[in-house]
Amino acid sequence: MANPKEKTPMCLVNELARFHSIQPQYKLLNESGPAHSKMFSVQLSLGEQTWESEGSSIKKAQQAVANKALTESTLPKPVQKPPKSNVNNNPGSITPTVELNGLAMKRGEPAIYRPLDPKPFPNYRANYNFRGMYNQRYHCPMPKIFYVQLTVGNNEFFGEGKTRQAARHNAAMKALQALQNEPIPEKSPQNGESGKEMDDDKDANKSEISLVFEIALKRNMPVSFEVIKESGPPHMKSFVTRVSVGEFSAEGEGNSKKLSKKRAATTVLQELKKLPPLPVIEKPKLFFKKRPKTIIKAGPEYGQGMNPISRLAQIQQARKEKEPDYVLLSERGMPRRREFVMQVKVGNEVATGTGPNKKIAKKNAAEAMLLQLGYKASTSLQDQLDKTGENKGWSGPKPGFPEPANNTPKGILHLSPDVYQEMEASRHRVTSGTTLGYLSPKDMNQPSSSFFSVESPSPTSSAPAARELLMNGTSPAAEAIGLKGSSPTPPCSSVQPSKQLEYLARIQGFQAALSALKQFSEQGLESIDGVVNVENGSLEKQAKHLREKADNNQANPGSITQDCKKSKSVI
């Protein structure tokens, strides 16, 4: 029976009514109030007495009227029965056998249970000469009682109960009461006899077949069971099994294969126990070498170019601390121009970051936290490429002179008026009557050395002449070098100004024309008779345009000189 304090008033009223053999009746008298706040009135009739009470629900009204009835009722109340005492009651609802196993492991003494036969009944003889009333000879059977012997080290305990498990629990309770306050014995080196006794105790719960296999495994001997004979009628079979363990063999007979196998194992086990004991070999202690860390991320430059969120998480993992905690603080701005504020917390450090979306705000918050913790900023890969000067469109060597600080678009070379006039004057001084050379689209992809018919002079002798020609417009040394060939050709009559610039750049030792023309062809830039236009065309369109222009030049050879004068240099 549960504790009466935990019972509800209605339950106690039912017990009171059951004790007096009456039926309690609950009646709903009235229901008032609005729908969200109703009040219910309930009447309780218990015998000739009635009580009324109200509540916000029918159940609460019933409990209130039952509580009122318990306090005002004149009926005698039943005596509460004491709770049943559990013999095996222990804290934690742990069975005594489990608790004893833990204590025995601490003491280093195994707990071994052995069932015992029940005590014999006394020899009782009835008086058969009784002449009186009818003597009933069929007595009710005596309840069966189980007995168990418990051995813990050198201590023995006996338990009894209606079941085998109850007997084990009873013996375990006695052992706990006796051993709980005793000190834990110190482990002492055991001699051969005590070790043998312990082995015998452990082997008491093992079958003979298991013991044979264990001994054979320790001594590295093969084991085989074989049924060599089977005789008798079908309902009374007899089997003979032979067991061979190394050099030992034995036979066993029984009415089943299992029984014959067990008897054969028992016979050969007696022979195996006569063998000398094995030498004790100490097992070597396993030594686990601690692997060194192959990756050391202690460099100050580690993490450059990495995502700040991942970098901060790796830093916390390396510190073996809690991972960063990100919280969205606020969201402000217009619907299409949102601004998110994200906060990150690492230990006692707090940092915030803003961005047009949550991802960027979280990234900025992580970057701010890294700076706050003393780490360098996580620069992006594009910033690193810009710092090192790498560019996918330029594959040649880097120039050794600084770039001019102007706002002119890339790809257009602006000449001063004086230099331009001197270059035009030098073009007019070139002799006419030379053959014109045209470039086919196929020749556009050839190296710059194939565009000139004369042999390219050495850089040491031609570099000063090229520099003088580029700066002053005329150069006697350049004219002397150009007259060495059999048929000197003027620069404008044979090649375009862009090719002249490429030739001069090659003499100076850097590339300027070929790769730059390819780059601006991909971007849609081309040179058209004095005006530079930007198109969104591809490289194929530019090649087609150059091919058509070459065909037009072949059809109108007289316009070449005019085009050469009006053309501008495009890099």
Swiss-Prot record:
One of its GO terms (biological process) is intracellular mRNA localization. The modification Phosphoserine is found at residues 188, 395, 416, 426, 440, 456, 493. GO terms for molecular function: double-stranded RNA binding; Hsp70 protein binding; kinesin binding; mitogen-activated protein kinase binding; mRNA binding; ribosome binding. It is found in: Nucleus, Nucleolus; Nucleus; Cytoplasm; Endoplasmic reticulum. Keywords: Cytoplasm, Endoplasmic reticulum, Microtubule, Nucleus, Phosphoprotein, Repeat, RNA-binding, Transport. Expressed in both somata and dendrites of hippocampal neurons. Residues 83-94, 552-562 have a biased composition (Polar residues). The keyword Repeat applies. Residues 381-571 are annotated as: Required for dendritic transport. Residues 194-203 have a biased composition (Basic and acidic residues). A motif (Nuclear localization signal 1) lies at residues 273-317. InterPro entries: DRBM-containing_protein, dsRBD_dom, STAU2_DSRM_2, STAU2_DSRM_3, STAU2_DSRM_4, Staufen_C. Residues 71-94, 178-203, 382-413, 546-571 are annotated as: Disordered. It holds the Pfam family Staufen_C. One of its GO terms (cellular component) is dendrite. Residues 8-75, 95-181, 207-274, 307-375 form the DRBM domain. The keyword Cytoplasm applies. A motif (Nuclear localization signal 2) lies at residues 373-412. Identified in a mRNP complex, at least composed of DHX9, DDX3X, ELAVL1, HNRNPU, IGF2BP1, ILF3, PABPC1, PCBP2, PTBP2, STAU1, STAU2, SYNCRIP and YBX1. Interacts with the exportin XPO5. This requires RNA and RAN bound to GTP. Interacts with microtubules. Isoform 2 and isoform 3 may also interact with ribosomes, and this association is independent of translation. Interacts with TRIM71 (via NHL repeats) in an RNA-dependent manner. PANTHER family: DOUBLE-STRANDED RNA-BINDING PROTEIN STAUFEN HOMOLOG 2, MATERNAL EFFECT PROTEIN STAUFEN. RNA-binding protein required for the microtubule-dependent transport of neuronal RNA from the cell body to the dendrite. As protein synthesis occurs within the dendrite, the localization of specific mRNAs to dendrites may be a prerequisite for neurite outgrowth and plasticity at sites distant from the cell body. The DRBM 3 domain appears to be the major RNA-binding determinant. This domain also mediates interaction with XPO5 and is required for XPO1/CRM1-independent nuclear export. This is Double-stranded RNA-binding protein Staufen homolog 2.
